[in-house]
Curated annotation (Swiss-Prot):
Transmembrane segments: none annotated. The keyword Hydrolase applies. A motif (JAMM motif) lies at residues 173-186. CDD domains: MPN_DUF2466. It comes from the Bacteria. Keywords: Hydrolase, Metal-binding, Metalloprotease, Protease, Zinc. GO terms for biological process: proteolysis. This is UPF0758 protein Patl_0046. Disulfide bonds: none annotated. One of its GO terms (molecular function) is metal ion binding. It comes from Pseudoalteromonas atlantica (strain T6c / ATCC BAA-1087). Zn(2+) binds at residues 173, 175, 186. Belongs to the UPF0758 family. The keyword Thylakoid does not apply.
């Protein structure tokens, strides 16, 4: 049965308009993105098949161009459309941060960093560079590693903070496993970075570890 033949309250677009996007499942949201199905499958059925094929919404979004385009019902145009949607989301959060005092907007900071790092297939270490009022100067991805680690050099971070004239920084990195729990190695490198930054009076306000849709704050854990 075509979606247009469904009761109005069950159609994804109508449901979003009346109940808001939070009321929709991953498959329903993806169906809106797809717009149409394929022969024998509605857009919602196709969306469910794609989520099963890639394992999750995260798996679909982080798929390589080749794997994405080979999936039935997708293609290069959809890949480009998806990448543009992701980039718009990231720029939206960056613009929101630039308007707010980052240190006083912990939840907004988490949302931004999750959008930036959650779908990275390998570990990435970055930092938010802030001015004396804790307003965002720039977000930089500094080090890129393997699926379970990235080499981090405090002196390089200090040099970048000086070049950007930052008075404070918020550190961040992702765990590609999806588990955001800080490790002992994370705590050790954070202590080294704090020590290096303090020599030049640059404050490390927090270190956020990003997993699958969540971010754990060192400051909230009392680790900074």
């Amino acid at each position: 049965m075509k979606i247009t033949q469904w009761p109005a309250h069950e159609r994804p677009r109508e449901k979003l308009l009346t109940q808001g996007p939070d009321a929709l499942s991953d498959a329903e949201l993806l169906a809106i993105f797809l717009r149409t199905g394929i022969k024998g499958l509605s857009a919602v059925d196709l969306a469910r098949n794609l989520l099963n094929t890639f394992g999750s919404l995260r798996g679909l979004i982080s798929a390589s161009q080749q794997d994405f385009c080979l999936a039935k019902g997708l293609g290069e145009a959809k890949f480009v459309q998806l990448q543009a949607s992701i980039e718009l989301s990231q720029r939206f959060f960056a613009e929101q941060l630039q308007r707010e005092t980052v240190f006083n907007s912990a939840q907004q900071t988490k949302h931004f960093l999750i959008a930036q790092l959650r779908d990275e297939p390998n570990e990435v270490f970055g930092m938010l560079l802030l001015d004396s009022q804790h307003q965002l100067i720039k977000f930089r991805k500094m080090f890129f590693g393997t699926i379970d680690s990235a080499s981090v050099y405090p002196r390089v971070l200090v040099k970048q903070a000086l070049e950007d004239n930052a008075a404070a920084v918020i550190l961040t990195h992702n765990h590609p496993s999806g588990v955001a729990e800080p490790s002992q190695a994370d705590e050790h490198i954070t202590a080294r970075i704090i020590s290096a930054m303090s020599l030049l009076d640059i404050k490390v306000l927090d270190h956020l570890v990003v997993g699958d849709g969540v971010a754990v704050s060192f400051a909230e854990r009392g680790l900074i």
